[in-house]
Amino acid sequence: MSKIRVYELAKELRVPSKVLINVLMDEFGVEVKNHMSVIEDEDAALIKELLAGSEANSELVAEYEAELAEEVNNAAKKKKKRKKGSEDDNLEQDVEVIEIGKTITVKELAEKLNKPVNDVIKTLIFTGVMAAINQEIDFETAEKVAEKYEVAVYEKEEENTLEEFEEETDVEEENLAKRPPIITVMGHVDHGKTSLLDAIRKSKVTSTEAGGITQHIGAYTVEVNGETLTFLDTPGHEAFTAMRARGAQITDVVILVVAADDGIMPQTVEAINHCKAANVPMIVAINKMDREGANPDRVKQELTEHGLVVEDWGGDIIAVPVSAKTRENIDTLLEMVLLTSEMQELKADAGRKAKGTVVEAKLDKGRGAVATLLVQNGTLHMGDSIIVGSTYGRIRAMFDDSGKKIKSAGPSIPVEVLGLSEVPAAGDRFTVVKDEKTARNMAEARKEKIRQESFATSHRVSLEDLYSQIKEGSVKELSVIVKADVQGSVEAIKASLEKLSTDDVKVRVIHGAVGAISETDITLAAASNAIVIGFNVRPDNNAVAASERDGVEVKTYRVIYDAIEDIKSAMIGMLDPEYKEVVLGTAEIRATYKISNVGTIAGGYVLTGKLVRNADVRVIREGIVIFESKLASLKRFKDDVKEVNAGYECGFSVEKFNDIKEGDIIEAYTMEAVQRKEL
């Protein structure tokens, strides 16, 4: 049965602790010694009924208060007759209450208790805690110490939590003013992203130094027709998606660069899907128009195959033919960016405390932690205290994109700052707080929260818990990434999955492509809370590590029907995961030997885990599964063995398969029975 302390109940009922003690003893016959005594919840409930606001009960409280007042007056008269400095030990003062945060140093606790530090340390030792004067202790430990001194402790609610800052919605419409748009450039490798950025920078960056030398801080601003544009100089869509995975939606417009002589390429498709998933408007820059084989109409045709119809052909996608080399139509492209941003009516309040996102960060040998911050709302000033993810600091110096020292930066302006305690991660949100102590406390709270979340079960969507999440209303849309060995399979799967959509949940294929499952696929899945499905393909080592780190579910199949049935069963709550595939180990083929009447024997090196004789195996060539069978034999030197661990060489043969080649990967796995889950 739970209990409550007298002072806690007194605070809840808004009556003095002494009044409550008298009521307990006189009216209920409950023996209590002082405000730290505990009473049963049943007694507390009865007292709440008695003292819950009626006039009679108010009179009862007033009666006891009058008696107490008389006692106090009598005690005061006696006190005058005593020597100066003596105390009335018989008069119990009202409850002494202190408030502390989730943690407090021993020195601060001693000051709050008004006790010598040595006494507090001794009390800590008696409670089994060894702590030095500047060491932090948690709230529970501080409460035990305070209890020894008969002092009540309340846990102070953080005045400003990061979540409250993030969720601030009290926007005054009249304070909003136009802000510059933030642009990211994406596209396939070698299609001219960097060249285009350089062309824009050279033609439009306002030079403040001889030669127009600018400092690379990951972002820069340009002037177009009196308007400012902010460009993020990030390495393609990987950084864009990594930021989005951390909750940082900072881009207003995306320039998709497509080479006029090359057309749509795999990374172009990825970039298109990333933009669609983020719901960010796109402008297509058809680059390399100076080349002989340039064919913009072919690019426009290929764009339509991915749901992007340009304005020339009756669509709403702006396409501008440009040349980064000759700077042809660069001005037109920038004007189109301005037009697109004007349609969005981008606004921010420059008068409030600054909030924004980390674009990039590094540890500089001479300057310490250096971060490029993009202000998204408010104005950032030198000397401001900020919380950035799980780090904090006070801005000691601030530089613009030309390396010039500045004192403040408004919305959509990138700045490089010094003064952070640690190097933050790209995509971390920053918020200005009232002082450095508040920032430190919030950073510590965030670190503790991250530590606890690392032990908690991942809340990423998975087939096993999909139905229950749908019922709870936490999943309205199931996002899927499809990878297969041939394009026909990708199209068939996309069509079949999208037909499964119901009123409760919509199935959406956000990306489909040919090839092995890569780390980029996992990053997109993490950002979009998606499931990755592979057909006759496997994830590479980086993808496996990323999926485990980010909690992304990767499912692989050999038969399309099985995948459709799995997702369908999950949606109706009938998925029955009786067996789970467990990868035992992988080995790389380094030599092959053909032996008459036996077949092909492979010499391999075990990369991870172990190979077990008679285990199920799959042969993987360039990321694609080409055969599934069993290990027919397993030898170490000339001896038959049951298993070979990672780091050792071995010889083996695969049952009914002789087309083994050097460089093939053998993946051994087993199907383990797992306990059935109720969905």
Swiss-Prot record:
<dbReference type="InterPro" id="IPR005225">
    <property type="entry name" value="Small_GTP-bd"/>
</dbReference>
<dbReference type="InterPro" id="IPR036925">
    <property type="entry name" value="TIF_IF2_dom3_sf"/>
</dbReference>
<keyword id="KW-0648">Protein biosynthesis</keyword>
<feature type="binding site">
    <location>
        <begin position="287"/>
        <end position="290"/>
    </location>
    <ligand>
        <name>GTP</name>
    </ligand>
</feature>
<dbReference type="Pfam" id="PF04760">
    <property type="entry name" value="IF2_N"/>
</dbReference>
<dbReference type="Pfam" id="PF00009">
    <property type="entry name" value="GTP_EFTU"/>
</dbReference>
<comment type="function">
    <text>One of the essential components for the initiation of protein synthesis. Protects formylmethionyl-tRNA from spontaneous hydrolysis and promotes its binding to the 30S ribosomal subunits. Also involved in the hydrolysis of GTP during the formation of the 70S ribosomal complex.</text>
</comment>
<dbReference type="InterPro" id="IPR000178">
    <property type="entry name" value="TF_IF2_bacterial-like"/>
</dbReference>
<dbReference type="Pfam" id="PF22042">
    <property type="entry name" value="EF-G_D2"/>
</dbReference>
<feature type="region of interest" description="G4">
    <location>
        <begin position="287"/>
        <end position="290"/>
    </location>
</feature>
<feature type="region of interest" description="G2">
    <location>
        <begin position="212"/>
        <end position="216"/>
    </location>
</feature>
<keyword id="KW-0342">GTP-binding</keyword>
<feature type="domain" description="tr-type G">
    <location>
        <begin position="178"/>
        <end position="347"/>
    </location>
</feature>
<dbReference type="InterPro" id="IPR027417">
    <property type="entry name" value="P-loop_NTPase"/>
</dbReference>
<protein>
    <recommendedName>
        <fullName>Translation initiation factor IF-2</fullName>
    </recommendedName>
</protein>
<dbReference type="InterPro" id="IPR015760">
    <property type="entry name" value="TIF_IF2"/>
</dbReference>
<dbReference type="Pfam" id="PF11987">
    <property type="entry name" value="IF-2"/>
</dbReference>
<dbReference type="InterPro" id="IPR023115">
    <property type="entry name" value="TIF_IF2_dom3"/>
</dbReference>
<dbReference type="InterPro" id="IPR004161">
    <property type="entry name" value="EFTu-like_2"/>
</dbReference>
<feature type="binding site">
    <location>
        <begin position="233"/>
        <end position="237"/>
    </location>
    <ligand>
        <name>GTP</name>
    </ligand>
</feature>
<keyword id="KW-0963">Cytoplasm</keyword>
<feature type="region of interest" description="G3">
    <location>
        <begin position="233"/>
        <end position="236"/>
    </location>
</feature>
<dbReference type="InterPro" id="IPR053905">
    <property type="entry name" value="EF-G-like_DII"/>
</dbReference>
<dbReference type="Pfam" id="PF03144">
    <property type="entry name" value="GTP_EFTU_D2"/>
</dbReference>
<keyword id="KW-0547">Nucleotide-binding</keyword>
<dbReference type="GO" id="GO:0005829">
    <property type="term" value="C:cytosol"/>
</dbReference>
<feature type="binding site">
    <location>
        <begin position="187"/>
        <end position="194"/>
    </location>
    <ligand>
        <name>GTP</name>
    </ligand>
</feature>
<comment type="similarity">
    <text>Belongs to the TRAFAC class translation factor GTPase superfamily. Classic translation factor GTPase family. IF-2 subfamily.</text>
</comment>
<feature type="region of interest" description="G1">
    <location>
        <begin position="187"/>
        <end position="194"/>
    </location>
</feature>
<dbReference type="InterPro" id="IPR009000">
    <property type="entry name" value="Transl_B-barrel_sf"/>
</dbReference>
<dbReference type="GO" id="GO:0003743">
    <property type="term" value="F:translation initiation factor activity"/>
</dbReference>
<keyword id="KW-0396">Initiation factor</keyword>
<feature type="region of interest" description="G5">
    <location>
        <begin position="323"/>
        <end position="325"/>
    </location>
</feature>
<dbReference type="GO" id="GO:0005525">
    <property type="term" value="F:GTP binding"/>
</dbReference>
<dbReference type="InterPro" id="IPR044145">
    <property type="entry name" value="IF2_II"/>
</dbReference>
<dbReference type="InterPro" id="IPR000795">
    <property type="entry name" value="T_Tr_GTP-bd_dom"/>
</dbReference>
<dbReference type="GO" id="GO:0003924">
    <property type="term" value="F:GTPase activity"/>
</dbReference>
<dbReference type="InterPro" id="IPR006847">
    <property type="entry name" value="IF2_N"/>
</dbReference>
